[in-house]
């Protein structure tokens, strides 16, 4: 089965951050003999670029896509919005999990971003 890994982030594209996630994921995937990593793609934080790459992969014999990056709480983390748009789905807030996160951050004395959704 063919696998693609998509790493998302402007910081990866411009070289300010090294993409270690896709290497780790690829190493874990090759432990399974029936899976073959056939594509690793880096995409900037752009909804249209994410959707375009996803469309290409889904139409080119890829069985599984692993996506990493763009899932934080800052304004440029738009992976979930891009996926919701691509699959014509709506994002739903899991209130109980959100409350657990808030409690975790409070107990650890970590200030959460106001953009945490």
Residue ranges, per PLM feature:
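Structural motif
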Residues: 44-55
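Short, high-confidence coil segments that cap the C-terminus of an alpha-helix
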Residues: 61-63
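Short glycine-/acidic-enriched loop or helix-start segments at secondary-structure transitions
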Residues: 15, 76-78
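Glycine-rich phosphate/diphosphate-binding loop of Rossmann-like nucleotide-binding domains
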Residues: 1-45
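Proline/glycine-rich low-complexity loops and linkers
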Residues: 49, 78-117
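Short glycine-rich anion-binding loops that position phosphate/pyrophosphate groups of nucleotides
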Residues: 10-11, 70-73
């Amino acid at each position: 089965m063919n696998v693609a890994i998509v790493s998302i982030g402007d910081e990866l594209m411009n070289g300010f951050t090294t993409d270690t996630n896709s290497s780790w994921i690829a190493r874990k995937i090759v432990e399974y003999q029936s899976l073959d990593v056939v594509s690793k793609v880096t995409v900037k934080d752009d909804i249209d670029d994410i959707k375009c790459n996803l469309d290409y992969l889904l139409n080119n014999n890829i069985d599984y896509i692993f996506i990493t990056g763009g899932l934080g709480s800052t304004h440029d983390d738009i992976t979930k919005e891009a996926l919701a748009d691509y699959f014509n789905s709506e994002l739903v807030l899991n209130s109980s999990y959100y409350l657990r996160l808030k409690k975790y951050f409070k107990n650890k004395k970590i200030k959460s971003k106001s953009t945490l959704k």
